Design a protein with these regions (language model features):
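Active-site Tyr-X1-5-Lys
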Residues: 119-151
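Conserved Rossmann-fold NAD(P)-dependent oxidoreductase catalytic core, especially the SDR/UDP-sugar
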Residues: 51, 55, 60-125, 144
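C-terminal amphipathic/interface module of NAD(P)-dependent oxidoreductases
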Residues: 1, 209, 240-246, 262-289
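Glycine/proline-rich active-site loop of Rossmann-fold NAD(P)-dependent oxidoreductases
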Residues: 145-147, 161-174, 207-218
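Glycine-rich Rossmann NAD(P)(H)-binding loop
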Residues: 161, 187-190, 218-226, 236, ...
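NAD(P)H-binding glycine-rich loop region in Rossmannoid oxidoreductase-like domains
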Residues: 6-8, 17-73
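Alpha-helical substrate-binding/gating segment
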Residues: 176-185, 190-218, 223
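Mid/C-terminal beta-alpha module of Rossmann-like enzyme folds, strongest
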Residues: 203-263
Length: 289
């Protein structure tokens, strides 16, 4: 596995060891999405690659290139090194946010839909995932076909489920934490497709060797997009009394998003519902959401 700093490996191994014994099955190397060093060496002796790294925080960055540059350049570095090393297949973690169309109306996401990065409603994160994934497919299309590198792409929604360490500070889990602690006094009129981290991990592994996965995009998450109101009601009915069920008007959220970076990062979803066609993943991997 790759990390940005080898100083993190001790904690990672400790967290993994709570669940399985990783000895002899896990090695670490230090890689940076924005630097060339180490990529070719990291791929030596490998047959398959999972490229899951991409920067994300809940706030919209002042400069969208803080997301876009490492997402695109990191993907290209991984692909070039994989091709040079003779890797059989790469499985790339993209996102449902690369499938939003114009992000200006509710729609059903599927394998053929792409986010229009020119739309004013598209966040920097959505742009970064869209551009990174498109650059990957372009690389595959343009490569030397004599010994082709295969590609499969996984497109999850916001990721929930158990963490290795028990830490709930991640972007998606942090949203539920804020709901439970009453730190979200008014709810946005927005809906999200939820992805279980265990499903995502399983599909990534299955996509490595499943012949039918080559050249495909797979949405891994719920077919139905759940509104914040629905999530709040579920939490409320399960005893979380601090959860607010008050709804903020869309016009107010969109207006405030021009000045608030937390809200601006949600513009893709405010006032819209994106249901998803997960049938390709269900059929290919015999999987149920």
């Amino acid at each position: 596995g790759s990390v940005r700093s080898l100083s993190k490996t001790e904690k990672i191994l400790a967290d993994i060891s709570k669940h399985i014994d990783p000895k002899g099955n896990l090695e670490f190397c230090e890689l940076d999405l924005l630097k060339e060093e180490g990529w070719n060496e990291a791929m030596k002796g490998c047959e398959y690659v999972l490229h899951v790294a991409s920067p994300f925080i809940n706030k919209e960055p002042k400069d969208e290139n803080l997301y876009i540059k490492p997402a695109v350049e990191g993907t290209q570095r991984a692909l070039r090194a994989a091709k040079k090393a003779g890797i059989k297949r790469m499985v790339l973690t993209s996102s449902m946010v690369s499938m939003l169309g114009d992000a200006d109306k509710s729609t059903v996401l599927n394998q053929s839909t792409w986010t229009n990065i020119s739309s004013k409603n598209v966040s920097a994160y959505a742009k970064s995932k869209t551009l990174a994934e498109k650059s990957a497919w372009k690389f595959i299309e343009d490569q030397d076909k004599e010994t082709p590198l295969e590609l499969a792409v996984i497109n999850p929604g916001p990721v929930f489920g158990p963490t290795l360490s028990g830490d709930l500070s991640g972007a998606s889990m942090g949203m539920f934490r804020d709901l439970i602690q009453g730190k979200m006094p008014m709810l946005p009129q927005a809906s999200i497709n939820m992805s279980d981290v265990r499903d995502i991990a399983k599909i990534h592994v299955l996509a490595l060797e499943n012949k039918a996965a080559n050249g495909q995009r797979f949405i891994v998450g719920t077919e139905k997009a759940y509104s914040f109101q629905e999530m709040a009601q579920i939490l409320k009915s399960n005893g979380y009394e601090k959860v607010s069920t008050k709804v903020a008007p869309n016009f107010l959220l969109m207006l405030m998003s021009n000045f608030n970076r937390d809200l601006k990062s949600m513009r893709d979803f405010i006032g819209k519902t994106y249901d998803a066609d997960v049938s390709p993943a269900m059929k290919t991997f015999n999987w149920k959401p």
